[in-house]
Structures are given as C-alpha cells and as structure tokens.
Design a protein with these regions (language model features):
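Short helix-initiation/N-cap motifs at beta->coil->alpha
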Residues: 63, 79-89, 133, 151-152, ...
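Periplasmic-binding protein-like
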Residues: 121-128, 194-237, 253-259
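A ligand-binding cleft/hinge motif common to bilobed small-molecule-binding domains
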Residues: 89, 103-111, 157-160, 184-213
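Short loop->beta-strand "edge-of-pocket" segments that line small-molecule binding or catalytic clefts
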Residues: 36-42, 138-151
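Extracytoplasmic small-molecule ligand-binding "clamshell" domains
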Residues: 26-102
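Flexible hinge/capping segments at coil-to-helix
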Residues: 29, 129-145
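Ligand-binding clefts/hinges and TM-proximal coupling segments of bilobed small-molecule sensing domains
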Residues: 27-28, 153-166, 204-209, 234-259
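Short Pro/Gly-enriched coil loops immediately N-terminal to beta-strands
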Residues: 113-125, 141-142, 159, 170, ...
Length: 259
C-alpha cells in the first residue's frame, strides 16, 4: 500500500513521539553482554534483505548476517521490526542497538551514525532484453525507453542521459515490459537484478553493470558507541574470512556480493 507524503510524515511523527515518551539510550557492549541480547532494527518487509517467508519466519541477507554477528558476540539477537522511517526513529530513540537493513554509506549519514565495515558491495546496473545489443552503458540510453517507478532514485540518471521515462511501479512489472519489448531498459542496484534472476532463471534478460562507483552497505550504531562498533567490525571481519558472508550471499543472490 502506498501512502501520501503527508500521511507518511504524520505517521512517522506520531511513531517518533511515542518512542520519545519512553526514550532509552542504545546499550553499551557491556550491557549487551550482561543482558545476553543485542537489539537489531530492521524492516522485515524488504525482500531479499529483510522479510518473512511463507512460515512467517524473519529471514534475508541482512537478517542472516545480523544473526551471525550476534552469534560471534555470544548473545541472542532480538529484532525490532518497523518501516524505514519508524525503524530509524526507534533506533534514534534508543530502542535498538544496531541497524542491519541495507543502510547505504553516505557522507550525510556519517554525521549522525557510526558505520561498521561494509558487508555488501554493489554497482548500478542496467537490465535489457537478452537480444538487445544496442545498450552497453549509460551513454547508450539516449532516446531509449527506460522504465521506473514514479519516485525512483534513478530518474535523474534517465534525464541526464536523455532516455524517455516510462512509469511502472514494481520491478516485476518493469522487467515484464522489457521482456515484451515495450521498453528498452531499467536501472537499479545490481543486487536487485541478481535476486530477480535467481527467482526467474529463464527470464530473457541480461544485466549490464554500468556504474563505476561502488555502493557500500553497512550496519550503523549510535555515534560514539565505539566498543560495540569495534566488536561488530571484528565479528564481520571474522565472518568474511571464514567464508560465512559469501555463503549467505550465494544463498540469496547466487553471487558473492559481500566483497
């Protein structure tokens, strides 16, 4: 269900106010060890990263990594689920100790949060029909029909390279338009396409990794919570060396996107 911006703001404001009435600080590592629990904020509705399966079990790339980190820390994970805005409001209010939910690393967020070492690396990518040999990079998009949702973050890229915008809400709808050759392409984070191809291995499409700048995803903790950050970083580094992150990545994407 889609909400208007005004409703979304109002709902988020109410949630933030409710959290502020009973605000608490994010736990220190010592308190987490004492309690035996680390509180992890995540959305729970963002497949394949954080979602519920047919048995209503919480799973996903970020969720599995969070569980593996908790195990390395010797504590149990307690997941705090909420929509993106409400999730961050809960985290800001001290209701969670860490966020594992596809938080991309940006300079703006670095002012407010401390990031862990990255656990996902991806690039922007273009998807076209497997028979399309005209598009090999962003420079080839001029005059092409590029399909995106109405609020897509990729619309400025479409405009920059002179493509013609076609609107379709879901990724499946967008790719169906490509398969039927009613549009030429769509643009997104490459991992979204890896997931689609894993679910639809016979789809007549191909991925063109066109971005030069890597996009990193990491966990966030409260600014200054250095001991917890160091423990999470140590856990992630060990999981990487042991091949656990690669295994989780292959499970969800059929490709290693952990490094």
């Amino acid at each position: 269900m889609k909400f208007s911006s005004a409703f979304k703001f109002g709902a988020t404001f109410v949630v933030a106010c409710l959290f502020s009435l009973n605000s608490a600080s994010a736990n220190s590592y010592e308190q987490i060890k004492k309690d035996g629990v680390i509180r992890i904020a995540t959305e729970g509705v963002y497949s394949p990263f954080s979602f519920h399966n047919e048995k209503d079990e919480l799973m996903g790339y970020d969720v599995d990594i969070a569980r593996a980190v908790a195990k390395k820390l010797g504590v149990k994970p307690k997941f705090i689920e909420a929509s993106w805005d409400a999730m961050l409001a809960a985290f800001d209010a001290g209701k969670a100790d860490v966020v594992f939910n596809q938080v991309s690393i940006t300079d703006e967020r670095k002012k407010k949060y401390d990031y862990s070492v990255p656990y996902m690396l991806s690039y922007s990518a273009i998807v076209v029909h497997k028979d399309n040999n005209d598009i090999k990079s962003f420079a080839d998009l001029k005059g092409k029909r590029s399909v995106h949702s109405v609020n897509s973050m990729w619309i400025p890229t479409v405009e920059k390279y002179g493509a013609k915008l076609v609107v379709a809400d879901s990724l499946s709808d967008q790719i169906n338009l490509i398969i039927t050759k009613r549009v030429d392409d769509t643009i997104d984070d490459a991992v979204m396409f890896y997931d689609y191809i894993k679910q639809h291995p016979n789809a007549p499409i191909k991925i063109i990794e066109a971005g030069d700048e890597p996009m990193y995803t990491a966990a966030i903790v409260k600014k200054g919570n250095k001991e917890l950050l160091n423990k999470i970083n140590n856990a992630l580094n060990k999981l990487s060396k042991e091949g656990v992150l690669s295994e989780i990545s292959l499970k969800y994407f059929g490709k290693d996107i952990s490094k």
